[in-house]
UniProtKB/Swiss-Prot annotation:
The gene is recA. InterPro entries: AAA+_ATPase, DNA_recomb/repair_RecA, DNA_recomb/repair_RecA_CS, P-loop_NTPase, RecA-like_C, RecA-like_N, RecA_ATP-bd, RecA_C_sf. It comes from Gluconacetobacter polyoxogenes (Acetobacter polyoxogenes). Keywords: ATP-binding, Cytoplasm, DNA damage, DNA recombination, DNA repair, DNA-binding, Nucleotide-binding, SOS response. GO terms for cellular component: cytosol. This is Protein RecA. Gene3D superfamilies: P-loop containing nucleotide triphosphate hydrolases (3.40.50.300). GO terms for biological process: DNA recombination; DNA repair; SOS response. It is found in: Cytoplasm.
Length: 348
């Protein structure tokens, strides 16, 4: 390729990259093949596959994270798993339940210590975000979940009449709050998770008509954005016992994005660890699949996925060995998870 005389392209590129990182922060630009070098403090998502897909072993602390998807796709379940993992490490967690829909019994089944979980059920969006700001600035909270952005209704809308027009109020509220929160989140090393819903844009001819609520501010301020979808049902005979779930990392400032992982969310149990071990084991070549049979180190572990899952539940030592070997081959597994930015739906 023709090159302008007197210009060292590699030096010019390095200069441009360092200038971008100085202006916009570390991780704002990187080569797709680069492995993250900085040691980031993380909290597990409760899913081994998703921890690998995120590239740093979990969700980063001191950052804003957005989890979005359709109704009943597993957004709250994922957030509760992150809370449970943080509490296991001795962390303090808070849940701002703007939807007024948190089920303490379900949270307890996922491993959340509900007795020590801070919970707030605010009346208006301003109140919810003020509470979030106060908790973040205290520096004493490790994980703070806001469920959900769509339920952060501005006070003016609550006090007005039905049918009144309040164009842009919600987006303005989110934009203002995030400008305040982003610095505090970084300084206090708090993980701030926003759960968000999906809306359909009218009159979209090309591309995805789906959009998240609350304007564009959260898209910019979030270091990690994850799209979660229910892709099928898990049945035991005729009874539905769980959902097959797909999560795609659509934005990641900590490692290369566009990785996708699938796992099972079982009713009353949450993310199925043994189901993931089988899927990831097959990806890493640790578990062999021949027809309907699954085997590991020449030992058959079950005919059909559900039987193989039960075998690993009954043999925790084999499950632990598969998990150790999957973690050792995390790079291979992560490469197998890579998809294009527009595969299975465009960015929202």
């Amino acid at each position: 390729m023709a090159q302008a005389p007197g210009i060292d392209k590699s030096k010019a590129l390095e200069g441009a990259l360092s200038q971008i990182e100085r202006a916009f922060g570390k991780g704002s630009i990187m080569r797709m093949g680069e492995r993250p070098t900085e040691q980031v403090d993380v909290i597990s998502t409760g899913s081994l596959g998703l921890d690998i897909a995120l590239g740093i072993g979990g969700l980063p602390r001191g950052r804003i994270i957005e989890i979005y998807g359709p109704e009943s796709s597993g957004k709250t379940t994922m957030a509760l798993h992150a809370i449970a993992e943080a509490q296991r490490k001795g962390g303090t967690c808070a849940f701002i339940d703007a939807e007024h829909a948190l089920d303490p019994g379900y949270a307890r089944k996922l491993g959340v210590d509900v007795d020590n979980l801070l919970i707030s059920q605010p009346d208006a969006g301003e109140q919810a975000l003020e509470i979030a700001d106060t908790l973040v600035r205290s520096g004493a909270v490790d994980v703070l979940v806001v469920d959900s952005v769509a339920a952060l209704v501005p006070r003016a809308e609550l006090e007005g009449d039905m049918g009144d027009s309040h164009v842009g109020l919600h987006a303005r509220l989110m934009s203002q709050a995030l400008r305040k929160l982003t610095g505090s989140v970084s300084r206090s090393n708090t993980m701030l998770i926003f759960l968000n819903q999906i809306r359909l844009k009218i009159g979209v001819m090309f591309g995805s008509p789906e959009s998240t609520t609350g304007g564009n501010a959260l898209k910019f301020y979030a270091s990690v954005r994850m799209d979660i979808r229910r892709i099928g049902s898990i049945k035991d005979k005729d009874e539905v016992t769980g959902n097959q779930t797909r999560v795609k990392v659509v934005k990641n400032k900590m490692a290369p994005p566009f990785r996708q992982v699938e796992f099972d969310i079982m009713y009353g149990e949450g993310i199925s660890k043994v189901g993931e071990l089988i899927d990831l084991g097959v990806k890493a070549g640790i578990v062999e699949k021949s027809g309907a049979w699954f085997s590991c180190d020449s030992q058959r572990i079950g005919q059909g996925r559900e039987n193989a899952k039960q075998f690993l539940r009954d043999h925790p030592e084999m499950a632990a060995d598969i998990e150790r070997r999957v973690r050792e081959q995390a790079g291979v597994v992560a490469e197998a998870m890579l998809v294009g930015p527009d595969e299975d739906g465009a960015e929202h």
